[in-house]
Regions:
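A beta-rich soluble binding module of mature secreted/lumenal proteins
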Residues: 19-187
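Positively charged n-region of N-terminal signal peptides that target proteins for export
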Residues: 1-5
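Bacterial N-terminal signal peptides
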Residues: 7-15
Length: 187
């Protein structure tokens, strides 16, 4: 399974090489506070890509590295294989630590954009994130579910920025024994 994941990362990430820009019309948040963003986030909705296809219970965990970069651990449950998949990466700020514009690598020198374009500034409970173009979109939250108003805000804002919100996938977070046993594991 790790070989398959490595192959997928090898095939996908080169396509993102040099894709550390921001999609037209999308501005990263300013006044960003990385210490408040660290920790576990649940993927609520996304535009689908091969590297996440078929995954449920998807989470991302962000922590500071000794070198000042951010450690990223993405996890998801592969429904068809009945197994957990995990990828570890590194994120670096593009415009300084107070701007939600980062580049993320899960494979060597190849980086893709990670643009936080909307954020719950009061409590850091949700974030709207884009990649290098409008085919990459995520709604992340601190809890496995969010109020419908947040989802509606996400859809409205994303649609106004050119994302195809009709293709959103809403990620299942369940309470299967496997999910409970693995979801609580924070590294």
């Amino acid at each position: 399974m790790k070989n398959l994941l490595s192959l997928l990362v090898f095939l996908i990430i080169p396509g993102l090489a040099g894709c550390a820009g921001t999609p037209a019309g999308i501005d990263p948040v300013t006044g960003f506070q990385v210490d408040r963003y660290l920790g576990k986030w649940y993927e609520i909705a996304r535009l689908d890509h091969p590297f996440e296809r078929g995954l449920s219970n998807v989470t991302a965990h962000y922590s500071l590295r000794d070198d000042g970069d951010i450690r990223v651990i993405n996890r998801g449950y592969n429904e068809s294989d009945g197994r957990w998949e995990e990828a570890e990466g590194r994120a670096k700020f593009i415009s300084g630590p107070d701007v939600g514009s980062l580049k993320v690598s899960f494979f060597g020198p190849f980086y893709g954009s990670y643009i936080i374009f909307e954020l719950d500034r009061e409590d850091y409970q949700y974030a709207f994130v884009s990649g290098p173009d409008t085919s990459y979109l995520w709604l992340l939250a601190r809890t496995p579910t969010v109020h419908p108003d947040i989802v509606n805000k996400f859809i409205e804002k994303s649609k106004s920025l050119g994302f195809d919100t009709d293709k959103l996938i809403y990620v299942k977070h369940d309470e299967t024994p496997e999910a409970v046993n693995q979801q609580g594991v924070d590294k």
